[in-house]
């Protein structure tokens, strides 16, 4: 439902990422049984992808760019060609503010050879990339993996703040802290590809 955040949990190999891929219209191989409905309507895969954003488990950032440059690059790729540069800049600044990235907007992202932004900031930049298109539903695969408990809490708090816009958020999450877990509205637990538990 709109304005709610759902945690998707289960052991490795239980089908969490596969389920996210199906829901986001990203699954292109294998048989899919059943239907994916959006607000009670069946949509074509392309329409579904236009309404959703997806954040992969592993960072997909270009280390040589600054945070703002990375977001502008993504805006150039994802937004319609008719979108003016000024409008793209407004969107980029908006997601920078939403995710608390103002302090590192002009910092180089970095890589193994070049120091850059922190792990928590990198996760929030990945979330910002998905928000450029203003999706109504945001799917995230393990957004807190590789982070210490403090950074993981910050990332989940950033996601929770996005609910105020009526967005729906679904994320796979492994061993969340009690503080992070308390921010989720609903929990789905998968086991061997089947729903073992679903509820608030």
Predicted regions and their residues:
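The feature captures the beta-strand-to-loop junction immediately N-terminal to the Walker
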Residues: 9-12
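Short, conserved post-Walker A segment of ABC-type ATPase nucleotide-binding domains
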Residues: 6, 17-29
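ABC ATPase C-loop
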Residues: 130-131
């Amino acid at each position: 439902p709109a304005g709610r955040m759902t945690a998707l949990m289960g052991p490795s190999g239980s089908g969490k990422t596969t389920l996210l891929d199906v829901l986001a219209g990203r699954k292109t191989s294998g048989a899919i049984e059943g239907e994916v409905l959006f607000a009670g309507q069946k949509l074509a895969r392309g329409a579904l992808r236009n309404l959703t954003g997806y954040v992969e488990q592993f960072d997909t950032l270009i280390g040589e760019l600054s945070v703002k440059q990375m977001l502008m690059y993504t805006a150039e790729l994802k937004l319609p060609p008719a979108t003016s540069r000024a409008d793209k800049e407004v969107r980029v600044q908006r997601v920078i503010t939403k995710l608390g990235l103002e302090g590192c907007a002009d910092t180089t992202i970095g890589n193994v050879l070049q120091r850059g932004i922190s792990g928590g900031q990198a996760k929030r930049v990945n979330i910002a990339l998905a928000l450029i298109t203003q999706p109504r539903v945001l799917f995230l695969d393990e957004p807190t993996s590789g982070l210490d408990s403090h950074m993981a809490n910050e990332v989940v708090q950033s996601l929770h703040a996005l609910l105020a816009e009526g967005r729906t958020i679904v994320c796979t999450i492994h061993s969340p802290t009690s503080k992070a877990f308390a921010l989720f509205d609903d929990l789905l637990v998968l086991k061997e590809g089947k729903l073992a538990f679903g509820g608030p």
